[in-house]
């Protein structure tokens, strides 16, 4: 569901799923209609840097962070196989930071500088499109020299904030700095250098003679 929704539901003949949000508390209701209920696993995007508590059917439960998560931290919560399951998550701490809220426009061989927000840190870089000629990571800034063809590109930085870890995408646009070919404007033609050319002979000739 979209991140800004505070309630939603979906239902099929076999299962119903309902979600509600009130301030820092998210509640998920799962109803199964199988003869033998399955063990549901809830995977959700984190929306804050810490979790105050997780409960499954009012019983404290554990959660796991999925290491390969990208875009947002992804959490996994497993429940017992019952016909009705209620999972409650209480969040706390600061909202998750974004390194680049907008897509920077950079020339090839240009430089990219990103400020790392207070409370966050980065430890790794994954560059599948090879757009980073070189880069440095510090406690407060990420700097890189950009290379590559014009267009939209993405690389990823492994971000840590509070209890959350995830691969955060950084989108950049490499602008086209190549000069367009020059053309002579018709107004620049010098009439005294022009001469008449008779095409009648060619236009009226046989196709094999042209």
Which residues make up each language-model segment?
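Non-catalytic C-terminal accessory modules of carbohydrate-active enzymes
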Residues: 1-135
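Aromatic/hydrophobic beta-strand junction motif of beta-rich domains
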Residues: 32, 44, 110-118, 124, ...
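Surface-exposed, short loops/turns at beta-strand junctions within beta-sandwich domains
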Residues: 79-83, 145-152
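Short, aromatic- and glycine-rich surface loops/edge beta-strands on solvent-exposed regions
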Residues: 85-91, 150-170
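Low-complexity, Pro/Ser/Thr- and charge-rich linker/hinge segments at domain boundaries
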Residues: 95-117, 168-195
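Long, low-complexity acidic/proline-rich regions
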Residues: 125-129, 143-144, 153-157
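Immunoglobulin-like IPT/TIG beta-sandwich domains and homologous Ig-like subdomains
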Residues: 129-148, 204-207
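Alpha-helical solenoid repeat scaffolds
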Residues: 140, 154-158, 174, 180-210
């Amino acid at each position: 569901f979209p991140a800004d929704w505070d309630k939603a539901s979906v239902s099929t003949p076999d299962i119903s799923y309902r979600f509600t949000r009130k301030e820092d508390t998210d509640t998920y209701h799962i109803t199964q209609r199988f003869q033998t209920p399955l063990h549901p696993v809830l995977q959700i995007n984190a929306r804050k840097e810490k979790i105050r508590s997780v409960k499954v059917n009012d019983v404290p439960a554990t959660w796991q962070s999925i290491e390969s998560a990208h875009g947002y931290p992804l959490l996994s919560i497993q429940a017992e196989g019952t016909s009705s399951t209620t999972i409650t998550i209480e969040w706390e701490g600061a909202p998750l930071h974004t390194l680049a809220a907008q897509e920077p426009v950079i020339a090839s061989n240009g430089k990219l500088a990103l400020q790392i927000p207070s409370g966050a840190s980065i430890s790794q870089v994954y560059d599948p499109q090879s757009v980073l000629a070189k880069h440095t990571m510090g406690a407060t800034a990420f700097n890189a020299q950009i290379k590559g063809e014009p267009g939209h590109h993405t690389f990823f930085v492994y971000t840590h904030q509070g209890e959350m870890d995830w691969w955060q995408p950084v989108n950049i646009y490499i602008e086209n700095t190549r000069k367009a070919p020059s053309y002579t404007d018709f107004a620049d033609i010098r009439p005294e250098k022009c001469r008449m050319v008779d095409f009648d002979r060619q236009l009226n000739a046989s196709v094999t003679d042209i």
